A protein has these predicted regions:
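Extended hydrophobic/aromatic segments used for targeting, binding, or gating
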Residues: 416-445, 617-641
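Short amphipathic alpha-helix adjacent to the substrate-entry channel of hydrolases
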Residues: 403-419
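Serine-dependent carboxylesterase/thioesterase catalytic core
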Residues: 112, 116-191, 195-196, 391-395, ...
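C-terminal subdomain of alpha/beta-hydrolase-fold enzymes, centered on the catalytic histidine
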Residues: 545-673
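Bacterial N-terminal signal peptides that target proteins for export
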Residues: 2-14
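Bacterial N-terminal signal peptides
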Residues: 12-23
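Flexible, membrane-associating and regulatory peripheral segments of lipid-active enzymes
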Residues: 25-389, 398-404, 420-423, 666-673
Length: 673
């Protein structure tokens, strides 16, 4: 028994000894399967698949795998830095695709660790302090971002497969984002260097350290766009709240930026720069139009070379600045790629900084800081091949009235390719006739400046969109007055003899006109063609007496309103003349305008609001304008929407406006392509 027991113990000891000996083998390292499985949710799967240094703060799975293949996941690449990047560059065991995409992300990781100067911004997104000097980390930071751009560029266009062959791969989207971000950051760095006088070399060449940037020729921007930006803002850094409902972009290649210019109109509430004040004095009196002072742009860095080695050693990239409204695709090394664009950022930033809402009320009541003449804003640089879509706001309003209208229209590719949006900003305290006359003169100046021969597409088939009082002005632009307005006012208005004489001498040129030949279609939105009841009520008359006309107006044609006396509207000098009085249904002017014949060559449409869905349509109103005043019996179309007076912002109204514009394009044999 003792022998048997000893044999059992010996055999057991032998088995454990063998198992311990075999413990180093992979198959017997543990008591269980060598591969285990666990379930993940779809969200976790997508996060693992698409997460990278930008979205999660950690390297992507693709880069981690490449580091493992190269044997760099431990040791030199245990923490981010230049040694890891140099080791990856020296690796000979990974494909170029994997190497370049991983190096782009590793350089990005390194760039994000470098300190950046902190700047404080106001609620409107404006930097509180200007860049006056560059920090000590400027050059290393620029070098890192340029390396990101170059490695990403090499991956996209100079590795084993073309960009089209990788079209549906998540990795290509990641690397494209690295390139776009790197170009964005490098562009801002370049602008800061320019602003501080650090840039050296000729105007078309900028040298910063090892890099020489070659400025590519412009792709046709107008002369207005040659202004120097006072600020360069990445569109991706902006977040908008308030009434703006959406941000519209086009995915693609390039950095989306907003170039903030000084506003020559001086309409913004914030103080203009010294340069703007100097130019404003010389331009405001003569130039009543300008481009929107915050145009969007897309920037590319193009690295030269016939092969991968040449691209990776190109320290003289070409800097291309594109207008995304003009250019939708670019050719890079024989491949057509879409150009990235942000169609909302520049427009929204302009409105956010303008303080138009307060200024329009100051203007109406004659407060300090208002405006006294109309100004035409072009939402993009003038394009001779795009027709004009001109928007005119209403009483006590401003371009802010069109924030969602313009934004939603410009998301439509066909409308964006066919039209360029212009908006009038005008003092709504002025008599309607004077605003209309000033706008006509402005349009004449603009077309004469850009198209003296009148042959450009932009000079023909304009579409007008007018809201409320802006619709009345739009109607005047397509009407023939003859002597009707002057005769009617002389016959019906309660005027003194002095007022009548002033009307004949100074008023007649303003009240006599023909249809604007450029206009072929008009959309009237909540327009009081025959005035309103509200303007004639006690409250309306009281508000009307608070309206203050600019002194320059009082000294000119508006003296008609005050018996030749430069006096505020106090109700003691006969016929009152201001915008609110003009909208009274019993006002001789608005009644005369309603009888003017509109051009038979012009198509017109009505978008009308009713505050309540119940009741007969003929007895409804939008809170201010009754249906009987906004209805036109011979309109091409009429759309009635349950809404308040600001119906232009309602989604059904924008949808109807898009329908009308597409109908217009079809009528002109245009598809927007």
């Amino acid at each position: 028994m003792a022998t048997t027991g000893l044999g059992f113990i010996g055999r057991t000891t032998l088995i454990f000894t063998v198992l311990l000996t075999l413990g180093g083998c992979a198959t017997l390292r543990q008591f269980g399967p060598s591969v285990q499985v666990a379930s993940v949710t779809p969200g976790q799967y997508i996060a693992l698949k698409r997460g990278d240094i930008l979205t999660s703060g950690k390297l992507s799975a693709a880069t981690i795998e490449t580091l493992r293949v190269a044997g760099l996941d431990e040791g030199v690449c245990a923490k981010p830095g230049l040694p890891c990047i140099e080791a990856m560059e020296s690796s000979i065991v990974v494909r170029e695709e994997d190497k370049r995409s991983s190096l782009a992300e590793l350089w990005l990781q390194y760039a994000m660790t470098l300190p950046a100067p902190k700047r404080e911004y106001s609620a409107s997104g404006r930097a509180k302090t200007a860049v006056t000097e560059l920090d000590a980390d400027f050059q290393p930071r620029l070098d890192a971002w340029m390396q990101v751009a170059r490695q990403a560029y090499a991956y996209l266009f100079f590795t084993e497969r073309t960009a089209n062959q990788r079209g549906f791969e998540d990795r290509q989207t990641q690397v494209r984002d690295y390139y776009n971000l790197a170009v964005q950051e490098a562009s801002v760095q370049l602008y800061n260097a320019y602003a501080t006088g650090r840039v050296h070399g000729q105007a078309s060449h900028f040298q910063l350290g090892r890099w020489t940037f070659v400025l590519a020729p412009s792709d046709g921007a107008s002369a207005l766009d040659q202004r120097t930006p006072s600020e360069l803002v990445p569109a991706a850094s902006l977040s908008f709240t308030g009434t703006l409902r959406s941000v519209h972009r086009r995915d693609g290649f390039g950095a989306e930026l907003v170039a903030v210019m000084d506003d020559p109109a001086g309409s913004t509430a914030t103080a203009p720069s010294a340069a703007a004040q100097a130019t404003q004095a010389s331009t405001s009196a003569t130039q009543s139009w300008s481009e929107m002072p915050s145009p969007s742009m897309t920037v590319l860095l193009r690295f030269s070379g016939k092969n991968l080695w040449e691209v990776l050693h190109d320290d003289e990239p070409e800097l291309e600045i594109h207008d995304p409204y003009q250019v939708s695709e670019v050719t890079l090394h024989g491949q057509q790629v879409p150009l990235a664009a942000n169609f909302t950022a520049g427009y929204a930033l302009w409105l956010a900084r303008s303080n138009f809402s307060r200024q329009s009320l100051r203007t109406l009541f004659g407060g300090k800081g208002g405006i006294d003449t109309p100004h035409l804003y072009m939402m993009q640089p003038y394009d001779p091949n795009r027709r004009v879509l001109l928007m005119i706001h209403g009483l006590a309003s401003s371009p802010e009235a069109w924030v969602n209208v313009a934004n939603e229209l410009l998301r439509d590719d066909e409308i964006r390719r066919e039209f360029q949006v212009w908006q009038f900003y005008y003092p709504t305290n002025m008599p309607i006739a004077m605003s209309h006359d000033a706008m006509r003169h402005t349009l004449t100046e603009v077309f004469k400046h850009f198209d003296p021969s009148g042959k450009a597409q932009a000079s023909h088939d304009m579409v007008l969109v007018g809201h409320s009082m802006g619709g009345v002005i739009a109607r005047l632009m397509i009407s023939s007055s003859g002597d009707h307005l002057v005769d009617t006012l002389l016959a019906t208005a309660q005027m003194t003899p002095a007022q009548r004489e002033l009307l004949r001498t100074k008023g007649a040129p303003v009240l006599t006109f023909l249809p604007e030949p450029e206009v072929s279609r008009v959309v009237f939105i909540a327009t009081p063609h025959r005035g309103t009841d509200v303007a004639g009520t006690r409250l309306g008359r009281w508000i009307g007496r608070l309206v203050r006309l600019p002194l320059t107006v009082l000294e000119d044609v508006a003296t008609i309103a005050n018996d030749g006396q430069i006096d505020r509207n106090d109700g003691k000098h006969g016929y009152q003349m201001n915008s609110i009085q003009n909208l009274d249904k019993d006002d001789p002017f608005v009644r005369a305008v309603a009888d003017l014949p509109m051009s038979p060559k012009v198509h017109y449409h009505s978008i009308i609001a009713r505050a309540k869905a119940d009741g007969p349509l003929e007895k409804t109103d939008d809170g201010l304008v009754p249906y009987w005043s906004s209805h036109l019996p011979h309109a091409d179309s009429e759309k009635v929407i349950v809404s308040g007076h600001s119906v232009q912002e309602a989604t059904p109204a924008i949808v109807e406006l898009r329908r009308i514009l597409h109908e217009d394009m079809q009528a002109h044999g245009r598809t927007g392509k």
